[in-house]
Every structure is written in C-alpha cells, then in structure tokens.
Amino acid sequence: MSAGSRNKHSKFRNDDQLDISKEEFSRIKEALGNEEFRKLFFDYVDEIQDPANRKIYEEEITQLEKERGVEVRFIHPQPGFVVKTSLDGELKCFINIASSPEIEAPHNEVATNPENGNRGLSWYIPMAQTSSRDDADAKNNHCKVFDVVFHPDALHLAKRNSQFRKCLVDTALDAVEREYQVSLDRANLKFPKLDYKGIARPTVIRKLAENPTAEQLEPHPLQNIYPTAPPTSNPEPRVHPMKTKAAPVPEFTIPRYSIKHSHDVDLSEYTDELDAKLHVTVPRNLVVEIELPLLRSTAECQLDVTSKSVYLLSEKPGAKYRLKMDLPFTVDDKAGSARFDTDLRRLSITLPVVRSSVPQQRDMHDTLRHFSREDSGVELHSNSESPVEEEEADADLSDSKADTSETVTPTATPVHSAPTPFLKKSVHYQLPAKFDCNVLDNVMAFVLHVANVQPDSIEQLREQRSLHIQFATIGSGYYPTHYAFYVELPADEEGGSAIENVEAEAWDNNVVLKLCLSSQSKSPIRYMAGLDATDLNEYPVHGQYTVKPKRRDAQNKESAPLDVKFDHNKESLEVTIRPVPSATEEDEVEEQHEESHEEHQQHAQNKKPSKKQRKRNKKERSLSESACEDIVQEQHAENPAPPAKNFLKLPQRKQRSYSECNDSSVGSGASQRGILKRFSRYGPRPSMSDSCSSIDDYSSSYSCSVDASGASLFSQSFGGIPEEDRSDAGLSESCKKTVRFNDHITKQVFRLDSSILGQRKKNQKRRDLKLRAQQRRLSEGDSVDYEESRGDALKPQGKASNKGNKLHDSGLDLTGTAAGHGSHSDADAKNAMMFEMDEDDVM
C-alpha cells in the first residue's frame, strides 16, 4: 500500500511527518550507540508507562487547566468488543466499542411510531470518539482503528439484548461515517474474538469551569484593550436525531473496481495511410481491477467472463461480494488472464480486445477511399443523421427481415407482414430546394438541383402513377445529407398517365429523372410533388414541347403566287411582296396593317430621333440562334397563320448598282445569286470580294431598286439566307450570318537605323492625311442636306423604323435611280472621287 493511501484517512499529513536533517540523524545514531544513553532512554519509557506516574501527570494537567478556568476530564477506554469491516472498499478497519464511567449513562422514554402508531422505547445513548490511528493487523498489513466510547451500562445492555447490541453497533458506525466522511461496508461485518484492538489511549474532554477562581475575578491589565468577551455559558451537548427506520442492509456488497485501457505503441499508426488510425481509439487490452479487502484468496469467489461482461460472486461469510459489469469493447473471453494480489487484496483481469478482421478492414478502407474523393466544395446542411446511426438502422432492418423469415411456417394459412417503409425512420430526409419539370411527347423529365450526389445511393420505388426516389450527397466534411423526392401524376387526367419506365442519372450539379409514360396517355399539365405521399403540393408543367409534322398549308403558301407592289417616294422606294390571300384572310391582314400603322405614327410623333440615333438605326443587332427560335415559337403561338407581308424602306445611300450589261442576268432565272458591294459613308471601302450573299429561294424578303423611267434596269437584294422550315422572312433577315474577307494586306516595315520618335512622326503624318481626306470628302455640302432630307423621309416610315429595326439593310441602292435628283453620271463621278481618296489614304 502506498503512502498516499495510508494517510488518506489519517489526521496526519505529509507536512506533519518527522522531518530531521542529516546532521540530526547522525547525532541520534551516535547517541543510540552509547550504552549509557540507551539505559537512560529505557528508564524514561518505563516511567511514562507506569500508571502511577501517568496519574500524577493527569492531576498536574487538570490543575493547570483549572487555573485557566477550564475543566478537564480524562477518559480511559475500557475494552468491550471489536467490529471488523472495510473502509471505502479498499482498506481494512477496526472499530473498538469501549466503555468509560465518565460518559453519561443511556436512558429511554416511551414514544409512538408516527408511521404505524405502535408504542416503543426511544433511547438516548451518549458517546465519545477518539481520533483515528494507523495500526497493523495479524499479518502486519496496514489497517485503520477507531474508538467509540459508551457508558458501561450500554455495553451491559448490549450483552443481554441482541436488538440493543445491533442498535449500539449502528450508532458507532454512523458516528465514524459522519465524523470522518468515509463509507463502511455494513454487509460484511465481522466480530473477531478481541476485546480491544491496539493500545488504549486516553482522550480529554474540556469545558469551561462553573466556579471561576479568585485569579480570574481579578481585572486583567489588558482587559480594556480587547473587546468585551461574550458571556460564558455551558454549551448544550450536540444531539443527533435517532433514526426511526433502520437503513436496509444489502445482502452483498458491490466492490470497488476500475477499467483501464491498455494500448501498445504501433509504428504503423503513424503513417499517412487512410486506414492507419482506424484503431487508435480501440485499446489492445482491457485491465479490470477489483478491490477485495476481506478476501484472502480467489478460491473463495466465482468469476465469469463473457465477450461483453464480467460477473464476480463471493458468498463467504464476512466477505460477500457481487459484481456485474458491462465492458465497453468486445473481448476475447478465452484468451484473458486473472491474478490476485494477496498483499493488496486486489484482483486484476486482463482481457484482449477483439478487433475487426482483415476483410472488414479492407471494406472500411474502400469506403474511406470512396468518401475521400474531391467534391465541388458546395457546403451542405449538417442536420442529418450520422453514418453510425444509418448502419444501425440497416442492421435493425436486416434483423427484422431475418425475424420475419424465421416466423414464416409452411402451413397453408397466409402470413401478411407489414410493408417495409421506403424511407428510413432513423434518417432525416430533405426535399430538393429547386427542381424543374419538362414534357416532350411521352417523356416527362425532372431536374433536381442537388450537387455531389452519390450514384450508388440512388434508390427508387416506382408505381403506376407515382415515383419515390431517395439519394445522398457527401460534402467537404465527408458528412452525408439525405434527400427524398416523391412525384405523383393526377388520376383525373383524361386518358390517364401511366409510368412505364424510369431512368435516373446523377451529374455533378443535379439529378435528371426521365419518366417514360405509356403511348396511350396524354401529356400531363400538372403534377403533385413533395417529400412523401403525405406531404404533396401541386405544380403546373411549364415546358411542353411536341414534335409536329410539316403542314401542307405551309407548302401551299410557299407555292402561292406573289403580288409585288412599288411605292415611289422622293427619298426611298417601298416594295411590298405578299402572296395572294384568300377572301377570308384579306380582312384580317388589313386590320392588322391599319393598327400597326397607327401605332408607328403615334410613336414617331412622340419621339423624334436625333442625328446620332438615326445613324445608329442603320446598324441593327443580330439575334442569337436560340433567341430566334424563342421568337418564332411566340409568333406561332400568337398568330398561327401570319400573312407573308414585308415592307422594306431603305434610305438613300451612294452605292454601286448593276450596270446595263447585267440587265439580262438579273431579270432572268427564278433563283438568282449576286455579289453586292455595300460600304459605309465614313468607314473604309473593301473590294468587290469582301461581302457576298446568296439566295436560293423566293421565301425570303425582296428589296428592289427601279429607276424613275420605269426601265427594266433594277437591282435585287435579299436580306439573308432563309433557314429551313421558316416562313418568317423578317426573322431570317435578323438571324443571317455574314462572312467578310478583306484582301488588303497591311505591311509595316521598320528600318534598323530608325528611331521611335521618327516612327511616331510618320504615324502622325498618316493620320493627318487621312483626316484631311475626310474633311475634303465632306466639303461638298451634301452631307448636311443628306441628313436633313433623310430625316424628313424617315418620319412617315414609322412602320419600318419604330419596330426595333427588325430588318437589315441589304446594301443595294434603291434611291439612286428612282427620284430623278441625279443621273448615273453624277453617281459614277462621286464614286470615282471616293475611290481616288481611298487610294490616296492607302498610299
């Protein structure tokens, strides 16, 4: 037993131990070696132990204390009987029940039990306690000794009455536990054949004297310095309430025990492998230590060890122990060992812990490697259940399935088992925050916007009109989040909608569900969706797409004859190309034309475009291919059969037109192809091969230029290449694709002896020449007149200019020969002058 445990229940602390120096120790050693000193020392010991000398010592102490106004009584314990038990389940202790005539005699009174009304005797038993002391038992083992002193009459009654003896023992045990704050083993009390354990030591009871002496009555010189002392009175003895009901004494005592985790140092756990630290928290062995201070050997007890528990039983009188303990890990009960320390009365049990096998470790390693893949870094919610709970739920589900299979009997009576729920009760599921639905023919597609979905976690339950699916995602912390989605088609649809096949695909950012409906069912217009069948909401189907065959009406309209009309104006020429409508369509076309014309006139009056805006209107932004498709669908939905009516109003520009030698080639042939030249007023002018357009069909928009004399000379320009199955010419004009090539090659030559400043001057000179050429080009005075005349001409043309510039300019001159303001020679002269300016700029 260690020194700490020895002094645990002693009033002596480490700082109260004998502390001597080396010099003092050597002096004591030298003195004890002297025979004369030893003789004197033994004489002193005999004098102290002599009862006559002790009586003289007590009288002197009593007289000295009486002079101080304190009455002192020495109590000498007389042997009675001894009680043996254990202290806190780990140390043997002895309680001496002694007697002394200095203690007040016990007395009783008649009392009534308040619980049942029975009459009995209530005993008043005075007692006194001495300080605890350390001692040794018969085998020289450490033990603890307590003295409890009663009046001799109390011990006399205890010898004659067993119930009073038990009451006296319980009173002594309660006094020791209350005074020293310890726990005594009441189930294993022994009464050895001893009258007293150890050597009796007297104790002192002090109290103030009732009759003060003459010296105390004399005033003290320091009496006025200190505050007035409180009046002295005899304190009443401390009375502890008697127990009306005895505490139940257990038949067996639960011994003290401890479980220690033993772990070896394994260098393989300090590597960077994924499975290196799988068993860091799992110990190698479990060491169970049980304190049995009242047992001499383990032959007197029974020990049973299983894979998950330890059971100990001792039925020896005076050492009754019983312990049933559950182990925190599964152990190998056949490979354990036990050892009993007779000195410490301690039983040590070593049990090896069972670890997972190699296949289980390999499966766990694969699972960790699957979880450790890189994700997209999207943070997910952490309010789902843990993987351990999920595994436990799976185990419970498998056990329930096994129990169900075992209860099935081969009798003819059918056994109806409850259906297993699709969603696990121990797992918290979430509904995807966002999902879309589209329908194409008999295919209904759902897009669930959930990222990082594990493909192997997708499970589905398909019925005739419903589908239930669940899946899980793994976030950056390897923590799963479970989702569920339930969709149900309404049963009141005409013709019904039955699900024949389901396909689920997991992508990086979403999950795509494809529901293949039966061929007889119609496309649903709404559906019910939610987490499960008990929580559903109704949603409409937004996107419905059907593949329709090409109608014959469109083919008839393409082959219909065209009606071409020319409207002459001072500044422009309006060409209208329309198919010959039927009698029923003429009224609708006229009404739409009148309404649109009124809207454009009103818009033109409210807003007058400035010069910069009129210049910007020449250029039009082309639409993307997807935007064109959306516009076509909206136009088809609003006007199923729009009339093929196009109005092209082009401003006067200085352009090149076809010469007279090309009249025959232009006017002949149904399908015409031409290479047209179109340049801006202020931009550079490319060559004839820079731009080209080809037309193979009459379904596109037409833009013609006819001279004022009505001759056969005209130029045709087509706004763009019409796309397949498109009857809207204006839309194909905005969606045309143009490829331009420039045959001018820019060459820059640097001389080795030239400086950067000289090159800068050369560039500045070239810019000055170009700016001078532009100013010379605008010095004719026709640019301002051209802008003003063009602005007056654009006002009545609200239909073509205020509609968002839906038509591109084909680049063909429609005004050069129509109004008669200039001749062919004037246009050719201006164009020749422009080309000469370009050549000067290039050189």
Swiss-Prot record:
HAMAP family noted in UniProt: Kintoun
Compositional bias ranges of the Basic and acidic residues kind:
564-573
Q: Which InterPro entries match?
A: Kintoun (IPR034727), PIH1/Kintoun_subfamily (IPR050734), PIH1_N (IPR012981), PIH1D1/2/3_CS-like (IPR041442)
Q: What is the lineage of its organism?
A: Eukaryota, Metazoa, Ecdysozoa, Arthropoda, Hexapoda
UniProt GO BP: axonemal dynein complex assembly; cilium-dependent cell motility
Annotated protein name in UniProt? Protein kintoun
Localisation per UniProt entry:
Cytoplasm
Question: What gene, per UniProt, encodes this protein?
Answer: Nop17l
Does the UniProt entry include the keyword Phosphoprotein?
yes
Where are the Phosphoserine modifications? S376, S779
Looking at the UniProt record for this protein, which Gene Ontology cellular component terms does it annotate, in alphabetical order? cytoplasm
Superkingdom per UniProt: Eukaryota
Give a short account of what the protein does. Answer: Required for cytoplasmic pre-assembly of axonemal dyneins, thereby playing a central role in motility in cilia and flagella. Involved in pre-assembly of dynein arm complexes in the cytoplasm before intraflagellar transport loads them for the ciliary compartment.
Q: Where is the composition biased (Acidic residues)?
A: 387-397, 584-593
Spell out the residue ranges making up region: Disordered.
212-242, 371-417, 545-672, 761-843
Q: Where is the composition biased (Basic residues)?
A: 605-619, 761-775
Per UniProt, the ranges with Polar residues bias are 658-671
Keywords attached to this Swiss-Prot or TrEMBL record, sorted alphabetically, are:
Cytoplasm, Phosphoprotein
Instruction: State whether it acts alone or in a complex, and with which partners, per the record.
Output: Interacts with Pp1alpha-96A, Pp1-87B, Pp1-13C and flw.
Q: Hey, which family's this protein in?
A: Belongs to the PIH1 family. Kintoun subfamily.
Q: Which organism is it from?
A: Drosophila ananassae (Fruit fly)
